Amino acid sequence: EFILIISGSNKSATKLYHQSMNLISRALIVNAIVKWFFMKIAIVRLSALGDIVHSMVVLQFIKKHYPDSVIDWIVEKRFQGVLKSNPHINQIHQVIFSSAKESKSLFLFWNELRKIRKLGKYDLVIDMQGLIKSALVARMISSDMTSGFDKDSLRESLAAIFYKRTYKIDYAENVIRRNLSLVSYALNFSVENESINRKEAFLYSAKEYVYDAVSATKKNILLIPGASYSSKCYPKEKFIELTRQIDANYIIIWGN
C-alpha cells in the first residue's frame, strides 16, 4: 500500500507524480518477479507411505520450472523418513495427528494445528491429500494462496471449503497425473505426457548405493510385500503365482 503526498505547482507536481508512479511500478514488478521465482512453497501430504512416494514425483517438476523455489513438506511423523533423502525438500515439518486420533483428543489435535500456525508465511500452500484433516492443516499455514482439489474431485468434499483456489481433476485419474495436474495448475506450468513417462526415479539422487542383487542379463522385478495396514497387503499366494508365470530376477524389499 502506497500513500503519495505531493506539494508544489501543478506542473512540477504532475511531473513528480509520474516519476513517483514509475518508480512504484518498477518496484512492484521487481517484487513480483523476485517473489515468483523465489517462491516459498508448502506441500501438505500427511500420509500414507505409498501416497507420499507418489506425491514426491511433483518435486522434480516444480524445481524444473522454479529452480530457486524453497519447498517444505508437512507430514505425519511416522512417515517423515521417506522424505529425508530428497534433495528438492528444504524442510520437513512433522505432525502427530495419529496420537490425537488414537486417544480421541481434540486438545492434541488442536495443539498440532497450533504448531503448524507457527511455521511462518508461505507464498503458496498445496494440499495434495484432499482430506478435511489435511485441508485444515493447509488453511492453518499462513500463506498468500492455498490450493487444492475442488469438491467434485475429493472423497471428502467438505475439504474444498478450506482452499482459496480449487481445481477440478478427475478422482479416477492416475494418481501421478492427478498430483501433477494439481501442482501444474497451481503454479501455472504445463506437463507433457512424455515428461511424466521419463520422470526421475524415486530417490534417484542416492547414486552412492549399489544394488548387487540387480541382474544384468534378466529383467528385474521388485516385490514389496509390506504395507502400513494388513488389509493393504497383497496375498503371498498371489506373489508366488506371479513369480511362477514370469521368468525374471526377483528382489524383495521389507522393513518395519
Per-segment meaning from a language model:
Residues 4-256:
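Catalytic machinery of carbohydrate-active enzymes
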